[in-house]
A protein has these predicted regions:
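Helix-rich effector regions associated with P-loop NTPase G domains
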Residues: 1-26, 34-43, 47-53, 66, ...
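Structural beta-sheet core signal
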Residues: 29, 55-57, 125
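Residue-level signal for short, function-critical loop segments
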Residues: 33, 59
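Canonical P-loop GTPase G-domain recognition
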Residues: 61-126, 145
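Conserved active-site beta-strand-loop modules that form the wall/rim of enzyme catalytic pockets
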Residues: 87, 137, 167-170
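Alpha-helical scaffold segments in soluble metabolic enzymes
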Residues: 95, 99, 135, 208, ...
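Short, structured loop/turn "capping" segments at alpha-beta junctions
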Residues: 107-111, 138, 144-150, 217-221
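Glycine-rich phosphate-binding P-loop
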Residues: 122-142, 172
């Protein structure tokens, strides 16, 4: 599996995020609810240097709710504010500002005690590619998407989007790379669409997805493709061929693989979480 991230790209991305940190009060770290650990940057704590953080578990509508609750607890224990959202339909988005204020309550109180006027909270959205950063920015900005220009005390050229009167977001999200060394993580990222399709063999990813659903969500898999208990006992390659035939693709393994991947990705097999708390959250 070849990934298009090189040391030069990583250094540049890290530098760009680090340079912007000084302008914000808080960082909104966006993760995919289906893989809340695998969709994080491996050097994030080092990059953010203790900056207050709100972890936004995005695409919560596609994730297993019981797993999401456990991951919320996990991030809370790490000392982060956390909120499950779905940036596509605004679910949870209205709670972002109150959560950010909650995370910054001590700082805001100190400013008030010093006699400083109330001001908008400044934030930056960061995350790996395809986790929903731009969608979230557009959702918060609404139709107006008014850039506030160069705010006082901010380096010239930093463009901000105002959300109501209490929040200003850097217009450009911080893009970071996921951890690719682990093949398991690579497959998870591919299955959810975080990696371009041409970068992997589709049948490998389809087989990985089927293996996962057989282990954790067999009833959802059976329901989607009208499978019997006997079908679920087949080897995964044989099961993929059976599904391929059931979908009317005869023996076109590639088309069958594409269908399985996109069905999983689009939530047609139901809600699921690839990063299992019981395996990765301790």
């Amino acid at each position: 599996m070849t990934i298009q991230w090189y040391p030069g790209h990583m250094a540049k991305a890290k530098r760009q995020v680090s340079e912007k940190l000084q302008f914000v009060d808080i960082v909104f770290e966006l993760v995919d609810g289906r893989l809340p650990i695998s969709s994080r940057n491996p050097m994030l704590d080092q990059i953010l240097q203790g900056k207050p953080r709100l972890v936004l578990i995005n695409k919560a509508d596609l994730a297993d709710p019981s797993q999401t609750k456990q991951w919320e607890t996990y991030f809370n224990k790490q000392g982060f504010a956390v909120l499950a959202i779905n940036s596509q339909d605004n679910k949870g988005s209205k709670s972002i500002l109150p959560k950010a204020k909650e995370a910054l309550v001590e700082k805001l109180q100190r400013e008030q005690q010093k006699g400083l006027k109330p001001r908008a909270i400044r934030a930056m959205v960061i995350g790996i590619p395809n986790v929903g950063k731009s969608t979230l920015l557009n959702r918060l900005a609404g139709k107006k998407k008014a850039k506030t220009g160069n705010s006082p005390g901010v380096t010239k050229g930093q463009q901000w989007i105002r959300y109501k009167n209490d929040l200003e977001l850097l217009d450009t999200p911080g893009i970071l790379w996921p951890k690719f060394e682990d093949q398991e993580i690579g497959k998870k990222l591919a299955l959810t669409g975080a990696i371009k399709e041409q970068l992997f063999h589709q049948d490998d990813i389809a087989l990985y997805g089927l293996d996962f659903f057989i282990q954790f969500y067999p009833e959802q898999l059976a329901k989607r493709y009208q499978l019997t208990q006997e079908d679920l006992q087949l080897s995964t390659p044989d099961l993929l061929m059976l599904i391929t035939q059931k979908q009317g693709f005869q023996e076109d393994y590639e088309k069958g693989s594409q269908r399985v991947i996109h069905d999983i990705r689009d939530g047609k097999l139901g809600k699921y979480t690839l990063d299992r708390y019981e395996e990765m959250g301790e």
